[in-house]
């Protein structure tokens, strides 16, 4: 079977319904404006400031940000999604951040939907159940889109399913030149809207291992290799100045910490945490998904068929990568990892445990594969056992979806929209917008000074407020 089979109704309907459900999350942001609620840790207190200052000095040709640390190097504030600086150049900060949230979630939804459609594509049995396959892909895609990733990181997490889909399509020999160019364009787009040090290094590393294994098995794909090079070059161009500084070439201004205190943790405790919970900013509520994966494998392991080979292989590889990632991250933070890193100079502070940022994409791809396998089994033989298995799996999936919705970035904004007295700290509250507007007005009325002519010192408020 080939991908020439285009999505038709009713799967088209499911796709559009899911897309609308994801885009609808932007409505509360439009209503609330500066009263919208965003996670402020590692977002409003840091990365948003990086975007604002870099956008402010986008064309001045200076290597210094005068507002930051009394004139620090531009490399001290590296943007996690460099192309998004244009949003902060053209739009108010709260609108730009809301756009990053909606756009990131939408790309995540579309990517996961297409990824699961690709997995189910070679199954003859599922080809007669396109509507149900579309519904399952829509469900898992929406779940991934609503995960509470920080939008300030661009496509570093939300963009992974689409990247994986494009890479898998590039491997197929019957792709047209136009299709290959589109897939390559997304690879570059992903690089421009993600960070090398957050998830990019892990993507490049695992992808390189994939290509090496494919070469050893004589299944090397030149199209995939070219795409890998494109992503690498994109990251090198984005981070060239920082790399030169790290290796002592060019400017001597220190923009990052030079001293680090590394503390080792228990390998097994960290491995268990990585596998069952995830890492910082990569918590994805996959507890029930792990259970679903276990009993799905038990249910279908003896009934594997050529008809579902791609789905089962995708599930197996996803689970294998999840375990590998959890192990690698635990080793990095363990006594062995800390001992090895101690002699690495500036690189010893590199957070390679961020490889865990790839895990949510793999967990939800695995969930989709489990649902497809159980659906295929149910279509093949409608017995009580298969009906119960599929029903229980759907109940656990809905339970996970409910948990995601309760923890999503949408929930507090819905509550704020309904009840303006809702107590969570808003964008306006965090940056003390009203207070600083009064300060600005007072200084202008009494001294004739405009904001570009003076600096605000933070006394009793978060430094980010003054920089904003």
Where are these regions (language model features)?
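Periplasmic/ER-lumenal interhelical loops and adjacent helix-loop junctions
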Residues: 236-302, 353
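Soluble catalytic regions of membrane-associated enzymes that act on cell-envelope
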Residues: 403-468
